[in-house]
UniProtKB/Swiss-Prot annotation:
Name listed for the protein in its UniProt record: DNA repair protein RecO
Species, as recorded: Pseudomonas savastanoi pv. phaseolicola (strain 1448A / Race 6) (Pseudomonas syringae pv. phaseolicola (strain 1448A / Race 6))
Family of the protein in this entry: Belongs to the RecO family.
Keyword Protein transport: no
Any Gene Ontology CC annotation: bacterial nucleoid
Length: 227
């Protein structure tokens, strides 16, 4: 049997576990992994924090792994203010939505790229909307953004509502929570210069995420509301 090899990872969340250990949720190309980190107050424990690129060797076949080795694999992504809150939001989304040990290498790569963009001070809203959409799509919850549930191209002057896990349905009577065709088409092209496109994208992603998050609110969203 070959010895375990290290793999790239980021810490999503860590909490104290028993005496000197920590229970850590990692994001890896092989999915979300939970592992026990021994001697969490030592050198390894100082690395077990979010936004630090790591190389981690996991041991064990069960759902709860053990960290055999953990090393830094690069410079930590330094963020403050709303960029930091945004990173925490990404972590919470992944913990809540990503199944354990379900490989999603594209999610891992997009997460790392999004952290870098946040640290560089790129506009937050487009980054968050892109991450939300690509996460939903990679998990199989995506839907067409340029056609309705009947396969018809979206009309610029049309009004649509989201049928979760089905797609966009055209409606002809005004009602709360509708989206304009022009906004949706702008979203499909990531053209945020169209008036109202970013705010509509935020509403759309909230609706799309809500059913998969269940009834529990995201704690990290409250950080944006605090003065």
């Amino acid at each position: 049997m070959s010895a375990p090899t290290g793999q790239p990872a980021y810490v999503l969340h860590s909490r104290a576990y028993r005496e000197n250990s920590a229970l850590v949720d990692f994001l890896t190309p092989q999915g979300r992994l939970r592992a026990v980190l021994r001697s969490a107050k030592g050198k390894a424990g100082s690395l077990a924090r979010p936004f630090v690129p790591l190389e981690v060797e996991f041991r064990g076949r069960g759902e709860l792994k053990n960290v055999g080795r953990m090393e830094s694999a690069g410079v930590a992504t330094w963020m403050t203010g709303e960029a930091l809150f945004s990173g925490m939001y990404l972590n919470e989304l992944l913990i809540r939505l990503l199944p354990a040990e379900d490989p999603h290498p594209a999610v891992f790569e997009h997460y790392a790229a999004t952290l870098l963009a946040l640290a560089l001070g790129r506009p937050l809203e487009p980054l968050l909307r892109s991450f939300e959409w690509r996460l939903l799509d990679d998990l199989g919850y995506g839907f067409a953004m340029d056609a309705d549930i009947n396969g018809e191209p979206l009309a610029i002057d049309g009004m649509y509502r989201l049928q979760v896990d089905a797609g966009l349905e055209r409606v002809y009577l005004l009602q709360p929570g509708l989206f304009q065709g022009a906004e949706l088409l702008a979203m499909s092209e990531a053209d945020w210069s169209v008036p109202g496109a970013l705010s509509a994208a935020k509403r759309l992603m909230r609706q799309a995420l809500a059913v998969h998050l269940g009834g529990r609110p995201l704690v990290s969203r409250e950080l944006f509301r605090k003065p």
